[in-house]
Amino acid sequence: MNPKRSFQALILTLHNYWADKGCAVLQPYDMEVGAGTFHPATTLRALGPKPWRAAYVQPSRRPTDGRYGENPNRLQHYYQYQVILKPNPSNLQELYLGSLEAIGLDPLLHDIRFVEDDWESPTLGAWGLGWECWCDGMEVSQFTYFQQVCGIECSPVSGELTYGLERLAMYVQGVDNVYDLNFNGREGAEKISYGDVFLQAEQEYSRHNFEYANTAMLHQHFIDAEKECLALLAAGAPGDSSNNRLHKCVFPAYDQCIKASHVFNLLDARGVISVTERQSYILRVRTLAKACGEAFLLTEAGGANWNREAA
């Protein structure tokens, strides 16, 4: 399949490229998240000493970015392609440029520039040294060296690559409106466009996010998710015995942290959170994320009982 002809071929090409580089090609996380970074394959797996390589597509929701389907390149629901490489390889930039070449962007024929742009996620308590990648004057992706996630220092440092799939597809297909993207690579009566798949949903979710979402219910959902996250962390906490030193409920707890984050974003879109309240909500979600990160380090996947020399 030609990645220049369809949205789905672009994704499949990236899957094949990163699979060949040793990544586990994972599925999207089945929850509402604001970015691919929220997937536990990145947020949690970036912590601890164990090596990790994964790639996946993640549907991402940013309610405040909705424009009722009237903006040609701004969406409240879009797709990111995420790659996490731990420890960070010395040739990360070379690998990234290779991925661009795989999808038809030859670095020798295009003006590829890296613009310094350090990344931060306040709700995840995460930040890293990063660069935007611009191709012929348009940002197409970003790569970051994680320094901290969940308020915890990353050791070793992970390399993260994030591709904005719609923007990248618009560039390689040469279209100016995201809804005109060829989705399935066919023409004529068999052609399915991005708009055929997503335009109605974009219009309806914009109404939901800005006009219809029940704010009283959302406030309660946030409180419930916060309480459940903390309760699950307490329930799964290690005991004093030698047979009970690992945490037993990190992923369910982290799901509740994700829920709280999305509910906060919906409340923000509805315009019912003041400036001071906004900072309070961010701090509350970050507190949950930090607690989940600390608990993850007490699991096998997080490196507890891991022998670096034996690995």
Swiss-Prot record:
Keywords per UniProt: Aminoacyl-tRNA synthetase, ATP-binding, Cytoplasm, Ligase, Nucleotide-binding, Protein biosynthesis
Entry's localization field: Cytoplasm
EC numbers for this chain: 6.1.1.14
Main localization, broad class: cytoplasm
A GO biological process held by the record: glycyl-tRNA aminoacylation
Keyword Kinase appears in the UniProt entry: no
A Pfam family hit: tRNA-synt_2e
InterPro entries for the chain: aa-tRNA-synth_II/BPL/LPL, Gly-tRNA-synth_heterodimer, Gly-tRNA_ligase_asu
Signal peptide range: none
Catalytic activity: tRNA(Gly) + glycine + ATP = glycyl-tRNA(Gly) + AMP + diphosphate
Subunit structure: Tetramer of two alpha and two beta subunits.
Record-given protein name: Glycine--tRNA ligase alpha subunit
Species in which this protein is naturally found: Rhizobium meliloti (strain 1021)
